[in-house]
Amino acid sequence: MERRIFGLENEYGVTCVFRGQRRLSPDEVARYLFRRVVSWGRSSNVFLRNGARLYLDVGSHPEYATPECDSVIDLVTHDKAGERILEGLLVDAERRLREEGIAGDIYLFKNNTDSAGNSYGCHENYLVGRHGEFGRLADVLIPYLVTRQIICGAGKVLQTPRGAVYCVSQRAEHIWEGVSSATTRSRPIINTRDEPHADAERFRRLHVIVGDSNMSETTMLLKVGATDLVLRMIEAGVVMRDLTLENPIRAIREVSHDMTGRRKVRLANGREASSLDIQKEYYGKAKDFIDRRGGDAVAHRVLDLWERTLRAVETGDLDLVAREIDWVTKYQLIERYRRKYDLPLSSPRVAQLDLAYHDVHRGRGLYYLLERRGSVERVTNDLRIFEAKSVPPQTTRARLRGEFIRRAQEKRRDFTVDWVHLKLNDQAQRTVLCKDPFRAVDERVDKLIAGM
């Protein structure tokens, strides 16, 4: 697929703290957070003017789903816009708490595990053609996805019975099967529930739920960009080596616990390979593919970062990507802190630092401290992120949805929207079904808006 539709959904961890003690239950905090949303949207599940969806997910986790994007750079920008929107709700909720005499700070974390060991996710969505063999897609993707954490994990200090260890992925401990149609009970690598949110005869939506949430813009670019390249190769019929894993679930944990990328995992054919071996195989194929077919600036940037990350892991010279890959950035931050204060990895102060990296409050979060210092590379910029808070991508269906919502709100009309429907709740109940996510212009929608 030359042009692909991408979408990211991020669930956020939420807590309210007063002098180090939890003051409100996550449920109550979430209600405060969403009070402003409910006051104008009459619901805690709304679509916004930028085409995105914001809602309270299972277990009081605020979730932001980006609008449909057809470029990875746009996707990164819109994912960050979601962070800013939630940061705005946080500031608003803290103010309201103070007015009600409840002292405390609300924290929103863009991470994947809380201290109680609960996991919440970052889900990636890729539009793929309906004609292909979905089973083959999964077969080729799973070894790639299991080992991909070595290039785009968010990193985590894991407390184990044998002491603390630094893992490259947060999600890996919580994945229980390879391919499944459930997302919460047993967490699979690829979710097959067939809701394309598009013309079902032409498209399928590949729903990848194994990835970590990223703070780093460049890590996000690599995560989605490399996956897109792998999908393009599968779609083009590139012959891939059979790297089917004997036990993907055991492998995903083994890979996560090995920062060197050298630990061997068993393949179904009886051979063994390390996460580095497997990633190098996919990277090599992708590089040949782009060398032969040509690629845009984004594809070249993705390949460059992919190669450097693999080299950094292989040589142990993590400085090569310390400004670009989340788990490396965080690992070096923790190591510097430990050396300075002579702390063991199991220290609560290290756990605090680990968490603070994911704080989305720009005046408080450690990732944003690094960004202000110019210590991390970027893909987008603050102006584009600010714009994306209210302006949808202009080249996809999100433009139609965003425009419809904006006009209906300005005219104070009652409306209902989802990913494919735009409906005016008047006597005529006029509804437009937008089945093509690539279409940013539609005269039926223009007519609907004009008739408000």
From Swiss-Prot:
Known function: Catalyzes the covalent attachment of the prokaryotic ubiquitin-like protein modifier Pup to the proteasomal substrate proteins, thereby targeting them for proteasomal degradation. This tagging system is termed pupylation. The ligation reaction involves the side-chain carboxylate of the C-terminal glutamate of Pup and the side-chain amino group of a substrate lysine.
UniProt keyword Metal-binding, yes or no: yes
BP GO annotations: modification-dependent protein catabolic process; proteasomal protein catabolic process; protein pupylation
E.C. number(s) listed in UniProt: 6.3.1.19
Active site (record annotation): 57
Note: The reaction mechanism probably proceeds via the activation of Pup by phosphorylation of its C-terminal glutamate, which is then subject to nucleophilic attack by the substrate lysine, resulting in an isopeptide bond and the release of phosphate as a good leaving group.
PANTHER family per record: PUP DEAMIDASE/DEPUPYLASE, PUP--PROTEIN LIGASE
Protein name per UniProt: Pup--protein ligase
Keyword Magnesium among UniProt keywords: yes
Catalytic activities: ATP + [prokaryotic ubiquitin-like protein]-L-glutamate + [protein]-L-lysine = ADP + phosphate + N(6)-([prokaryotic ubiquitin-like protein]-gamma-L-glutamyl)-[protein]-L-lysine
UniProt keyword annotations, A-Z: ATP-binding, Ligase, Magnesium, Metal-binding, Nucleotide-binding, Ubl conjugation pathway
Binding site for ATP: 53, 66, 419
Family in the record: Belongs to the Pup ligase/Pup deamidase family. Pup-conjugating enzyme subfamily.
GO MF annotation terms: ATP binding; ligase activity, forming carbon-nitrogen bonds; magnesium ion binding; ubiquitin-like protein transferase activity
InterPro entries the record matches: Pup_ligase, Pup_ligase/deamidase
Pfam families: Pup_ligase
Pathway in which the depicted protein is active: Protein degradation; proteasomal Pup-dependent pathway; Protein modification; protein pupylation
Residues bound to Mg(2+): 9, 55, 63
